Regions:
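Conserved histidines in hydrophobic membrane contexts and catalytic metal-binding motifs
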Residues: 34
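Short beta-strand->loop micro-motif that forms the acidic, two-metal-ion catalytic signature
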Residues: 50-53
Length: 105
């Protein structure tokens, strides 16, 4: 009989990210926050992990490299958006909801 796959929690994500400070700095991360279903504690086995990331140097290499790193770290699909992308969301209520729910690490 297979053991059930452990369920990743908001607290585990935050703890894991705090331990990765040096690596995050290598991708020029100024600030990283968790939002979406994991931040609300409503995740399912199929949920991706949503991050709002502010970069010191917002380059393609830093953005893409961070996305790959986070997916390997958490063994799950991630969605990464930046404050600029958040500002471009046309539905103000959606952007406000994200801003209000972000759990910064």
């Amino acid at each position: 009989m297979k053991a059930p796959k452990s369920r990743l929690t908001k607290a585990q994500i935050v703890r894991t990210l705090k331990k990765q400070n040096e690596t995050l700095n290598g991708y020029s991360v100024k600030r990283i926050g968790l939002f979406g279903s994991y931040a609300r504690g409503e995740q399912t086995a199929k949920s991706d992990i949503d991050f709002l990331v502010e970069f010191e140097r917002p380059t393609y290499d830093n953005f893409y490299g961070l996305c790959v790193f986070l997916e390997k770290l958490f063994k799950r699909k991630v969605e990464v958006i930046t404050p600029i992308a958040l500002d471009s969301i046309r539905v103000a209520e959606v952007a406000r909801s994200i801003r209000d729910s972000v759990v910064y690490v």
